[in-house]
């Protein structure tokens, strides 16, 4: 009984200490290499069979809790160093905010939205989203029968736009100023600094056609009951601008994006 009791006590205290984590053969991956790297570099007992040390050099094995604490500490140190580097980059710019080049690199997705293009030459095609919409319509038409496809063609059905509009790419030379979201007039920068030089800003604007047939009113509206007018509407896009205080930055400005019909009911009839 005494021997059994001593065996149970030894087993109990042995379970209180956890062996260090090791990668199982054939199970190495990104998770084990990234998060268990600290366990591999943690001090191990030199008397283990894996190390080949002698019995007199045996040390205590680190517990599972100590191993994870070390991993967490290393992750926090890496995060702190990254934050410190980011603060140092901001201070090196004189505290005046990020430069246009840094902002352009960090927000390159925003620069190529549906109606803004940063390029060294005039774009030859409409924005990508417009082309994707046309391609989708082409795929929809390809799945139709020949008869249905003929009747779905707007020209065959006699469909006409209520208001005639024109769309074209313009630059800051054509659009020198604009209105931002705060209602202030800002100057549109013609060129955007990039690491390899400068690129121009292009805006894809859509407005009512002054030479169209709807300059005197919307098409298809009963003039006996309504007074109609085709008007150009605007939307906000992001562009590199300069305010009245000579501060350059990325702001949302208004550009022409569509031509719509406005109606007014004639009263007294």
UniProtKB/Swiss-Prot annotation:
<dbReference type="InterPro" id="IPR020430">
    <property type="entry name" value="Brain-der_neurotrophic_factor"/>
</dbReference>
<dbReference type="InterPro" id="IPR020408">
    <property type="entry name" value="Nerve_growth_factor-like"/>
</dbReference>
<comment type="similarity">
    <text>Belongs to the NGF-beta family.</text>
</comment>
<feature type="signal peptide">
    <location>
        <begin position="1"/>
        <end position="18"/>
    </location>
</feature>
<keyword id="KW-0339">Growth factor</keyword>
<feature type="region of interest" description="Disordered">
    <location>
        <begin position="82"/>
        <end position="104"/>
    </location>
</feature>
<keyword id="KW-0325">Glycoprotein</keyword>
<dbReference type="GO" id="GO:0005615">
    <property type="term" value="C:extracellular space"/>
</dbReference>
<keyword id="KW-0165">Cleavage on pair of basic residues</keyword>
<protein>
    <recommendedName>
        <fullName>Neurotrophic factor BDNF precursor form</fullName>
    </recommendedName>
</protein>
<feature type="disulfide bond">
    <location>
        <begin position="163"/>
        <end position="230"/>
    </location>
</feature>
<feature type="glycosylation site" description="N-linked (GlcNAc...) asparagine">
    <location>
        <position position="143"/>
    </location>
</feature>
<feature type="region of interest" description="Disordered">
    <location>
        <begin position="39"/>
        <end position="61"/>
    </location>
</feature>
<dbReference type="GO" id="GO:0048812">
    <property type="term" value="P:neuron projection morphogenesis"/>
</dbReference>
<dbReference type="GO" id="GO:0005163">
    <property type="term" value="F:nerve growth factor receptor binding"/>
</dbReference>
<dbReference type="GO" id="GO:0050804">
    <property type="term" value="P:modulation of chemical synaptic transmission"/>
</dbReference>
<dbReference type="InterPro" id="IPR019846">
    <property type="entry name" value="Nerve_growth_factor_CS"/>
</dbReference>
<feature type="disulfide bond">
    <location>
        <begin position="218"/>
        <end position="261"/>
    </location>
</feature>
<feature type="propeptide">
    <location>
        <begin position="19"/>
        <end position="150"/>
    </location>
</feature>
<dbReference type="GO" id="GO:0038180">
    <property type="term" value="P:nerve growth factor signaling pathway"/>
</dbReference>
<dbReference type="Pfam" id="PF00243">
    <property type="entry name" value="NGF"/>
</dbReference>
<dbReference type="InterPro" id="IPR029034">
    <property type="entry name" value="Cystine-knot_cytokine"/>
</dbReference>
<dbReference type="InterPro" id="IPR002072">
    <property type="entry name" value="Nerve_growth_factor-rel"/>
</dbReference>
<keyword id="KW-0732">Signal</keyword>
<dbReference type="GO" id="GO:0007169">
    <property type="term" value="P:cell surface receptor protein tyrosine kinase signaling pathway"/>
</dbReference>
<dbReference type="GO" id="GO:0030425">
    <property type="term" value="C:dendrite"/>
</dbReference>
<dbReference type="GO" id="GO:0008021">
    <property type="term" value="C:synaptic vesicle"/>
</dbReference>
<keyword id="KW-1015">Disulfide bond</keyword>
<dbReference type="GO" id="GO:0021675">
    <property type="term" value="P:nerve development"/>
</dbReference>
<dbReference type="GO" id="GO:0043524">
    <property type="term" value="P:negative regulation of neuron apoptotic process"/>
</dbReference>
<dbReference type="GO" id="GO:0008083">
    <property type="term" value="F:growth factor activity"/>
</dbReference>
<dbReference type="GO" id="GO:0030424">
    <property type="term" value="C:axon"/>
</dbReference>
<feature type="disulfide bond">
    <location>
        <begin position="208"/>
        <end position="259"/>
    </location>
</feature>
<comment type="function">
    <text>BDNF promotes the survival of neuronal populations that are all located either in the central nervous system or directly connected to it.</text>
</comment>
